[in-house]
Amino acid sequence: MKMFITMSMCLSVIACFYAGVGTGETLVPALIIMGDSVVDAGNNNHRITLVKANFPPYGRDFVAHSATGRFSNGKLATDFTAENLGFTSYPVAYLSQEANETNLLTGANFASGASGFDDATAIFYNAITLSQQLKNYKEYQNKVTNIVGKERANEIFSGAIHLLSTGSSDFLQSYYINPILNRIFTPDQYSDHLLRSYSTFVQNLYGLGARRIGVTTLPPLGCLPAAITLFGGVGNNMCVERLNQDAVSFNTKLNNTSINLTNNLPGLKLVVFDIYNPLLNMVINPVEYGFFESRRACCGTGTMETSFLCNALSVGTCSNATNYVFWDGFHPSEAANRVIANNLLVQGIPLIS
């Protein structure tokens, strides 16, 4: 009975939210995005780095079929989230030429492909560290304050949803391939190391006036096509369980750390968004979600290609990415991002209620 009441309340709240969106009003004043390639909207485009996506076939199903720097064939989960919140445009990449006075008032995207909780991960790939993303956010706050005044600006910052999605690069592009880190840390110890950075980040963001913060869990790392290729052994197309176990362990600690932060920071709404289970369910039961393929990605051979390896000359790229859970070796397709975003909507009710 309790479960029924809770579900009914959730459905009622969602219905009210959609009614509000129907009037043309947004549910929050702004949407702020930080993190890695899963949510990068083009901040790496003009950096000297191999981690870019501003060329075909990336973006082939996006608005105007343009490669904006998003690591997908189309929309990111955060793009769908912006739509669900009532925004008519997506948070603009802060370092892009499109970032101007008008669209900055409804938020911005500071994410950078190959960034992580650990700044060392981003530095290795010449990506934008999480520390620098926070500095860019402070600069953004000054710009908004100059436009609308301090009082209105503070209302925007405190009412905005700040979404952080990172951590996969720390494991897949750093820890698992770096023998030095392997000697220094066990996977469990490395998680603790990352979560100390996460805790500091949230406290700093809170100090800048943020009161609504969402953070995504790690995905099932061992089910990403590139991870299966790199760590699964020859001829294996099954998820790598030890990597998934590391992700589950990290996610448990992420939840506990977030609870402690909420208890110690008055007025903070902090939600941990579970993307592990929604993505795992799509991998295990693709047909239930309308997918045909969940082990290989759409781009190229589907086993490894990402960033510059996923290009217009990649042989074997699929013609219809909606059949695939993954677009490239590391990133979900637009269709999978839509499923993830719908899950975020339900989980995120505490941030907008």
UniProtKB/Swiss-Prot annotation:
EC number(s) per entry: 3.1.1.-
Major localization class: secreted
GO cellular component: extracellular region
GO BP term (any one): lipid catabolic process
PROSITE patterns: LIPASE_GDSL_SER (PS01098)
Example of a GO MF term: lipase activity
Catalytic-site annotation from UniProt: S37 (nucleophile), D328, H331
One Pfam family, short name: Lipase_GDSL
InterPro entries assigned: GDSL, GDSL_lipolytic_enzyme, Lipase_GDSL_AS, SGNH_hydro_sf, SGNH_plant_lipase-like
Outcome reported for the amino acid change (mutating H193R): In strain: cv. Bla-10, cv. Chi-1, cv. Co-1, cv. Cvi-0, cv. Di-G, cv. Gr-3, cv. Landsberg erecta, cv. Li-3, cv. Mt-0, cv. PHW-32 and cv. Sha
CDD domains assigned to the protein according to its UniProt record, in alphabetical order: SGNH_plant_lipase_like
Top-rank lineage group of the source organism: Eukaryota
Keyword field: Glycoprotein, Hydrolase, Lipid degradation, Lipid metabolism, Secreted, Signal
Signal peptide: 1-24
Residues bearing carbohydrate: N100, N255, N256, N260, N320
Record's keyword annotation contains Lipid metabolism: yes
Locations listed in the record: Secreted
Family statement: Belongs to the 'GDSL' lipolytic enzyme family.
Listed name of the protein: GDSL esterase/lipase At5g03810
Organism: Arabidopsis thaliana (Mouse-ear cress)
